[in-house]
Amino acid sequence: GKGLGRVSLGAAKIQQTAEKVTTEATAATGTINYDVITQAVWNFTTNASGNWTLNIRGDGSNSLNNIMDVGESITIAHIVKQGGTAYYNNAVQIDGSSVTPEYQGGSAPTAGNTNSLDVYTYTVIKTANATFTVLAALTQYA
């Protein structure tokens, strides 16, 4: 398989795992390249300044398509700080190509939540070569 430091454990039991969190004084806006090789959770600590497109990829040198096998999934989280004017993730891409996520509750968000932390979670399932299903959710923390 491909993977990111993959280990085959057979029928082993996993007690716990730790996921890499990157925290940056960055404002969500424009197109954001989410490099899954770098982190599982990305925390933006500056108020969002515009709606944004999230492009999920392996990293600047590796496509998500090339690092995942068919039948694999990854789950990532994007924490976005919101101020008095809130913005939202209005588009999702994988390796630069648009995808339409399936949102929890059936509807994509149309706004962010003021004076909150908005946490977007995405489960990306590779169903065929360069074909992905994206399950998404937005949760407000205040």
State each model region's role.
Residues 95-113:
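Terminal beta-strand-rich extracellular "head" domains
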Residues 29, 113-117:
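Solvent-exposed, conformationally flexible loop/turn segments
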Residues 3-94, 125-142:
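Exposed extracellular interaction/assembly regions and N-terminal maturation sites
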Residues 116-125:
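Extracellular disulfide-bonded cysteine-rich modules/repeats
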